[in-house]
Amino acid sequence: KTTKLIAFYLPQYHPIPENDHWWGKGFTEWTNVAKAKPLFSAHYQPHIPADLGFYDLRLPETREAQAHLAQQYGITGFCYYHYWFNGKRLLHRVFDEVMITGKPDFPFCLCWANENWTRSWDGGDKKILIGQQYSQEDDLKHITWLIRAFKDPRYIKIQGKPLLLIYRTSDLPDPGKTAALWKEEVQKNGFPDLYLCKV
């Protein structure tokens, strides 16, 4: 068997209203990249992007170029970070356009980044900007939405099972119950099972 390389894909390289409100107009992940400073001798910072420059993910040609570049280096798919907060999606434009247009024609899966968004970048929960709220009702809404993505022919499957990553399984109130519900729903939709991975 051949090992397949899947690159994590952070869809934050374009502005959204929430980030404009929380961090200032025009904020994107490039804001943080460009202001990086060296912390020790020979620490090369900031790293200025090479091949694609300070790209904007709203542009379809950027996404096509990324897929082409990934293929050149042996990457076989993208794992898009997926942000779901009790039915509210953030940073969804890029993935929505990938689904609607069918481009790039490049395999993908999703990683649910189920952490609170906070005022700090250290993973702490001191000042929550938008928080996770878990419930069985939301689990059902979420898997219903996810199944639409699973049905895309580009979606990465392992032995027919859609591959879904979860960032913080320990934050789920009852991970086993959520997994059981999700597996039941994907089976109702014609898949043999769901291939869940913890990040």
Question: Which residues are covered by each model-predicted region?
Answer:
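Glycan-processing catalytic domains of CAZymes
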Residues: K1-V199
